[in-house]
Amino acid sequence: MQKQARIEPFLFFSYCFTKIMSISHSSPPSDASISPKSPLFLFGLLVFIGFSRYLPLDHSDFFNFSPTLAIFLIAGSYLRGIWSWTAPLCAVFVSDLFLNAAYGMNWLEPYMMITCLSYLVIFGLGKWIGPTRKLTFLAGGAIGSAVLFHIITCSFSWIANPAYIKSVGGLLQAWTFGEPGFTPAYMFLKNSVLSTLFFSFALRWAISLKPAQIPHAQTKTAS
């Protein structure tokens, strides 16, 4: 049930995100949430998530290295309004439709619904954390997001996959080593924790930029 992970260039990711955030707000958002008002916000998230999930990396050391969890965590913490959760969820849903087709799977797999539910849980965690300035809170939220996602999705794999014994031992196997013959589940968890930490701090940095610090923001304001 595990999907091959993706990785994307950090410079491209952070640059594009700061461009969209420069459109979405015109003042430092450190003290309040951001309300994304531009349709480009939805388009940007579609590009970000879709791009990150379509770049395969065959080396198992990087499986599950993705910004997706960080996007939902930061969206919950710093964005408000209906777009704060519908935009990233639509991006995941649309990219999943194409990924499932590429892997020869049905367009609407039960696993797809479970992952979307997991993302909403992480979004709720971000709402609970809020736009904190304390990096320790953000780090805790990032680690908690990765662990929650791992437990929810691996537990569903344990239920749905006949390769697992339906016992406590089988559940622990799903959480730790996974299905025999495949990359161990703990590798996915490790990379999920590292990537969520990395991209959460990257997104937090991008959001904290003042308009004058964002490329071309001064030119846009002057015009």
Language model: regions and residue ranges:
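Central hydrophobic cores of alpha-helical transmembrane segments
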Residues: L45, W85-S95, L138-A146
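Short, charged juxtamembrane terminal tails flanking transmembrane helices
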Residues: S22-D31, A212-S223
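Positively charged N-terminal leader segments that act as targeting/secretion signals
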Residues: Q2-L11
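Hydrophobic transmembrane alpha-helices
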Residues: S22-T86
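Structural signal for the C-terminal ends of transmembrane alpha-helices
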Residues: F51, I74-I82, V121-R133, W205-P211
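Membrane-embedded alpha-helical hairpins and interfacial helices in multi-pass inner-membrane proteins
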Residues: R133-A212, H216
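Interfacial aromatic-anchored transmembrane helix boundaries in multi-pass membrane proteins
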Residues: S52-N64, C90-W128
